[in-house]
Amino acid sequence: MSSHAMSVVILAAGKGTRMYSDLPKVLHTLAGKPMVQHVIDAAKHVGAQHIHLVYGHGGDLLQSTLKDASLNWVLQAEQLGTGHAMQQAAPFFSDDEDVLMLYGDVPLISVDTLQQLCAAKPQGGIGLLTVKLDDPTGYGRITRENGNVSGIVEHKDASDEQRQINEINTGILVANGADLKRWLAKLDNNNAQGEYYITDIIAMAWNEGREIAAVHPQRLSEVEGVNNRLQLARLEHVYQAEQAEKLLLAGVMLRDPARFDLRGTLQHGRDVEIDANVIIEGDVVLGNRVKIGAGCVIKNSVIGDDCEISPYSVVEDALLDTACTIGPFARLRPGAELLEGAHVGNFVEMKKARLGKGSKAGHLTYLGDAEIGDNVNIGAGTITCNYDGANKHKTIIGDDVFVGSDTQLVAPVTVAKGATIAAGTTVTRNIAENELVLTRVPQVHKQGWRRPVKKK
């Protein structure tokens, strides 16, 4: 790669009319994050010292969504073409740096391809990313003289002969800052669209005797843009297939790769098994021998060795120690923590709660703002009543406690080690060690009772 300092310009001013959306086009998500964020991440990984983001439609929403202090925001008040967009950013270019031009709606461009492009840029020339298509209709054609790139002709301006060319311009290029500023100043809009084309600088460079090096991406999907939701869905499919392939080759068993979604990053150990229709969001860590059942959603969580998550469970911002079992149909909300061997069964919800070693909450339970010790049994239908209408309060349960079914723990309350709470109890006061607590209404029997009969 060139040893020059480098800036990146990302064009993101388009309205995205064909998306039929109030959201700026580049904020539509692919794999769980805005398209333009994929491009920003690639720019950072390729070594950009400065990133200039050219925006127009929905600028306030763009800035509030991306929240990236490292970006230089450049307004393009009128959308008069790619050359015009680059002219808005040109005052920020240094003469001695390389400037790489990218697009906010071309989300799958790879760092490897960008590195190859930058390395191929000739001294004083231009590095240009091109591809060959079976059907190049609608794209700017690459013209060559004696095999060397000499210019780009937009489809609407191309002759019948030029339209037979199948090598097309992707729009991605890199050039020296001083050269780029000089060429941009010479652009005019004397063309069928009445716009300022960045592509015109290729002919300018050729006429100055500069070399233009054409580089091809590793995959066509890297340079495919998004103009409508169908194209976005297709790129999502491509991206997910690539991620699934990488995971399979790294030893993760995806039972159905076509029904797996990665919307973030996944670190994993050995012998991990993931069933169909699982969604991974944010930053997730899976230990060795973790098994995840069908239909689960795992988000921003760490799951230890030998854990098993049964089907249709949701785990978000949670921490699981080794050998924990979850679900089916369990929900771990932010702040949930399970220690070694803990079990959370079906229709159990936890939030800001810790379940100790070997403790179990088998079914139909809510545990919120709770600290639960080791070897505790939480009976079906138990609820920690943590909210009084204004503030949240904590429930503390010691080791070896037995909580019977249909128990309500009205926080703040503490249950000491070894206590037993009988089924159907409402706990409103602290319980001492090894106490039995029950608050049942006396059971009444009425012999020969007859139910009321409806009047006809």
Swiss-Prot record:
One of its GO terms (cellular component) is membrane. It catalyses: alpha-D-glucosamine 1-phosphate + acetyl-CoA = N-acetyl-alpha-D-glucosamine 1-phosphate + CoA + H(+); N-acetyl-alpha-D-glucosamine 1-phosphate + UTP + H(+) = UDP-N-acetyl-alpha-D-glucosamine + diphosphate. Mg(2+) binds at residues 105, 227. One of its GO terms (molecular function) is magnesium ion binding. Its EC number is 2.7.7.23, 2.3.1.157. Its cofactor is Mg(2+). GO terms for biological process: cell morphogenesis; cell wall organization; lipid A biosynthetic process; peptidoglycan biosynthetic process; regulation of cell shape; UDP-N-acetylglucosamine biosynthetic process. UDP-N-acetyl-alpha-D-glucosamine binds at residues 11-14, 25, 76, 81-82, 103-105, 140, 154, 169, 227, 333, 351, 366, 377. InterPro entries: Bifunctional_GlmU (IPR005882), GlmU-like (IPR050065), GlmU_C_LbH (IPR038009), Hexapep (IPR001451), Hexapep_transf_CS (IPR018357), MobA-like_NTP_Trfase (IPR025877), Nucleotide-diphossugar_trans (IPR029044), Trimer_LpxA-like_sf (IPR011004). Pathway: Nucleotide-sugar biosynthesis; UDP-N-acetyl-alpha-D-glucosamine biosynthesis; N-acetyl-alpha-D-glucosamine 1-phosphate from alpha-D-glucosamine 6-phosphate (route II): step 2/2; Nucleotide-sugar biosynthesis; UDP-N-acetyl-alpha-D-glucosamine biosynthesis; UDP-N-acetyl-alpha-D-glucosamine from N-acetyl-alpha-D-glucosamine 1-phosphate: step 1/1; Bacterial outer membrane biogenesis; LPS lipid A biosynthesis. The active site is at residue 363. Coiled coil: none annotated. Residues 1-229 are annotated as: Pyrophosphorylase. Residues 251-456 are annotated as: N-acetyltransferase. Residues 230-250 are annotated as: Linker. Keywords: Acyltransferase, Cell shape, Cell wall biogenesis/degradation, Cytoplasm, Magnesium, Metal-binding, Multifunctional enzyme, Nucleotidyltransferase, Peptidoglycan synthesis, Repeat, Transferase. Binds 1 Mg(2+) ion per subunit. SUPFAM superfamilies: Nucleotide-diphospho-sugar transferases, Trimeric LpxA-like enzymes. Acetyl-CoA binds at residues 380, 386-387, 405, 423, 440. Its main location: cytoplasm. Homotrimer. In the N-terminal section; belongs to the N-acetylglucosamine-1-phosphate uridyltransferase family. This is Bifunctional protein GlmU. The lineage of its organism: Bacteria, Pseudomonadati, Pseudomonadota, Gammaproteobacteria, Enterobacterales.
